[in-house]
Amino acid sequence: MARARLLFALSALVAASTTVAACSPSVSSSAPRDPFAAPIVPGQSARASAGSGGGHGTIDAPTPRSGSGTVTVALVGGAQLPTETAQEFTKATGFTVAVVPVDGVDAVAKAEADVVLGLDGADALQASAAGTVADAAPQDTTTLAGTAVDGAPAAVAYGRDDVCVIADKSWMSANNRPLPTSFADLSSPRVRALLAVPDPASSSVGRAFVQEAASQTGEGLGTFVQSLSPRVDATLGAAIGAWTAGDRVSDAYLSEVVGSASGASGAFPLVVAPRSLAAAAATNTGADSFGAPVSSTCIARIMYAAATTAPASDGAESLIAWLQGETAQRSLATTGAAYPIDGVLAADTKASWLMGITGEAVVADETMGSLDAMNAWLATWSSALAAPAPAPTTEPAPEPTTEQQASPAADPAQDEAGATGDDAADSDDEE
């Protein structure tokens, strides 16, 4: 009897196992063990999010030299060399890195650097003319087609990071302010007092903004600047600190920006900054940002590296060569430090999700041009800000009639909406 019970139990167990197997889907051995180990990107599967490698690079990058010692790197105008990227360089070559942030190219000489990162075309021309960078590119580097800077042969392209107006999307929406869709919108009554700008006289980022303003307004640059009511800060870091989403920017990013303060935020929802700021202000998912580059205000900028001496030190030459390689390009894209000049490596990274760059990575650097013209635009900016447009005047109103005297008058203070970020929010609450 006991034997019969045992046989019956075994038969039931086999039947149950067969039923479960028939109802259970098979799981591929290549499926990720934890499908939520990486943030899910809208429109992309969990598997792609967790396992995508971004493809292979297309640049025939040279092999960087190996060695020892420290390479001192000047980072211009918000350019980034994230810690994880620097560690990859050390692992590959043996050289270590020390970074010195500077706000503009005029400050590079004081940094006593071996190599400069983050130069745009105008910076490269200015640095070359001043003798701040070498007069030739290191021998173990590649100048990509379409990126050579006539007049600055030492400049070697490694990425792209346009300068734009970056909007705090949440603030603009909550306070019923329209996002600008053109440069002209920046001077509209409900927007013009919401902008923070790093000083173009000392900041490469601020200078690039003035160049784009001049390009879009032509001979009307002075009039346009007079119609603005911007906050002008001494450095890019100070401008980010005045941004309403400034406290959303990562400490890692701020540590490489002159004049920045961790956790600082202000009353200005629009700030002139590189596109990489949007990647640095990413939400917890990593797939969205508190900041949105306003594409109609952007000026295209290629990021260049240049050695400060010729011949370049072994460490400087090694870093410049390494930055063009697949590991470095992918690291820059993954961290959102820059859009890689090897555009295929941007796939499924912060750079592609948040920087707002579409199409080819290599484009004409729109900052390049006559240094004399640039100086003239900067002079126009300064003089226009010093003499803002006069307040509009109206003809004297006729004497009110008896009926008009009995009616309440409109408050003229309501004619101009929002002189500052805080005032703008208050006026909306009253509405």
Model feature map: region roles:
Residues 133-143, 154-157, 184, 269-270, ...:
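Short beta-strand->loop
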Residues 166-172, 300-315, 322-323, 331-337:
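A bilobed periplasmic-binding-protein/Venus flytrap-type ligand-binding module shared by bacterial periplasmic
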Residues 121-130, 151-178, 208-216, 300-306:
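Periplasmic solute-binding protein
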Residues 202-205, 211-297:
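Ligand-binding pocket segment of bilobal, Venus flytrap-like solute-binding proteins
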Residues 62-64, 112-119, 133-166, 184-185, ...:
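A structural signal for short loop-to-beta-strand junctions that line the ligand-binding cleft
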Residues 184-216:
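Short loop->beta-strand "edge-of-pocket" segments that line small-molecule binding or catalytic clefts
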Residues 23-27, 31-126:
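Early extracytoplasmic/lumenal segment of secretory-pathway proteins
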Residues 23-46, 314, 322-431:
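Extracellular/periplasmic juxtamembrane helices and adjacent flexible linkers that interface
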